[in-house]
Swiss-Prot record:
NCBIfam families: argC. This is N-acetyl-gamma-glutamyl-phosphate reductase. It comes from the Bacteria. Catalyzes the NADPH-dependent reduction of N-acetyl-5-glutamyl phosphate to yield N-acetyl-L-glutamate 5-semialdehyde. GO terms for cellular component: cytoplasm. Signal peptide: none annotated. The gene is argC. Its main location: cytoplasm. One of its GO terms (biological process) is L-arginine biosynthetic process. Keywords: Amino-acid biosynthesis, Arginine biosynthesis, Cytoplasm, NADP, Oxidoreductase. The active site is at 152. InterPro entries: AGPR_AS (IPR023013), AGPR_type-1 (IPR000706), NAD(P)-bd_dom_sf (IPR036291), NAGSA_dehydrogenase (IPR050085), Semialdehyde_DH_NAD-bd (IPR000534). Its EC number is 1.2.1.38.
């Protein structure tokens, strides 16, 4: 592009915010023009995040002072409840918005209010938002003014299911079980006893067993692709003693005669961030660390009619900031891979 895209980031002091800063710094077509934080206003970005020394000369500003309305696109890396209040003004001024919180993901307002425990401040915008699971909604994202970036668990679980659901390959009335594990960074950067090293290190536990906020988001995607499946969906998240990474093990029943590996390969043939592994392989979280990738394998369980899907992503990249940049690329007609060609870190 001859003119760089001017981007703003609202709420850039969390892990998702710094990941956006890292990825956008390497993007050839983007200039980060505004970075906001109410609590850190006046602090240099490079002082707050030493990993960005020599990369950014910006300082955090309050949202009112940052000139966000002068940006071409604004990313909200904020807690739930912020974007729905602040995004409408930017949209009215012609700024495109990608919201990495959950404010615009769930179309049924009462359902959203039940799970997030607050009244929605912009219910009229929810129907206008495009759900930004890039590999599912490319065409809609390309035309969007407002993108609801998916959650990390919904991304990891939905990507291996989308091709199968689109062809109605799952058996209705049968259980669909997602057993998921996340690194501690998925809980965010705020102080939390459960995220302390002495609590999360050398430990493994389930949480949200009575119901997790990502459950209705995943069910919404499933229900939109194949009837009779969402009702049998069960989702249990676990906290693993690692910083980054997400692993989903999904148990499902397929219609007779299905060849799921071929279905997945055909659907994702032209998707640069999707990797369908050879038969017998098992994806590892470290194989996607720091990269905007989803690696998937599928096999039939021994002596059973149950199929087992394994899916891994980096929860901060493909599960958050990387997918947001991918959506931005689609919105502005760029190659999806621009700024997202980093090779996973190993070890």
């Amino acid at each position: 592009m001859s003119k760089k895209i001017k981007a703003g980031i609202v709420g850039a002091t969390g892990y998702t915010g710094v990941e956006l800063l890292r990825l956008l710094a390497a993007h050839p077509d983007v200039e980060v023009a505004a970075v906001t934080s109410r609590s850190e206003a006046g602090t240099a970005v490079a002082d707050y995040f030493p990993s960005l020394r020599g990369v950014y000369g910006l300082a955090f500003q309050t949202p009112d002072e940052a000139g966000l309305e002068q940006c071409d696109i604004v990313f909200f890396a904020t807690p739930n409840g912020i974007a729905m209040k602040d995004a409408p003004r930017l949209l009215e001024q012609g700024v495109r918005v990608i919201d990495l919180s959950a404010d615009f993901r769930i179309r049924d307002i009462p359902t959203w209010e039940h799970w997030y425990g607050m009244t929605h401040a912009a219910p009229g915008l929810v129907s206008q938002a495009v759900y930004g699971l890039s590999e599912l909604n490319r065409e809609a994202v390309a035309q969007a003014r407002l993108v609801a970036n998916p959650g990390c668990y919904p991304t990891c679980v939905s990507l291996p299911l989308v091709p199968l659901l689109r062809q109605c390959r799952l058996k209705p009335g049968m259980p669909l079980i997602a057993d998921c594990k996340s690194g501690v960074s998925g809980a965010g950067r705020k102080g939390n006893v459960g995220s302390l090293l002495c609590e999360a290190g050398d430990n493994f536990k389930a949480y949200g067993t009575a119901g997790h906020r990502h459950l209705p988001e995943i069910r919404q995607t499933i229900a939109g692709l194949q009837d009779g499946i969402a009702e049998g969906f069960v989702f249990t998240p676990h906290l693993a003693p690692m910083i980054r990474g997400m692993h989903a093990t999904v148990y499902l029943h397929l219609s007779d005669g299905s060849d799921p590996e071929t279905v997945l390969r055909d659907y994702y043939r032209d998707s640069p961030f999707m990797d369908i592994l050879p038969a017998g392989s098992t994806p590892e979280t470290r194989s996607v660390r720091g990269a905007n990738l989803c690696r998937i394998s599928i096999r039939q369980a021994a002596q059973s009619d149950v199929w087992v899907v394994l899916s891994v992503i980096d929860n901060l990249v493909k599960g958050a900031a990387g997918q947001a940049v991918q959506n931005m690329n689609i919105m502005f007609g760029l190659e999806e891979t621009h700024g997202l060609d980093a090779i996973p870190l190993l070890p």
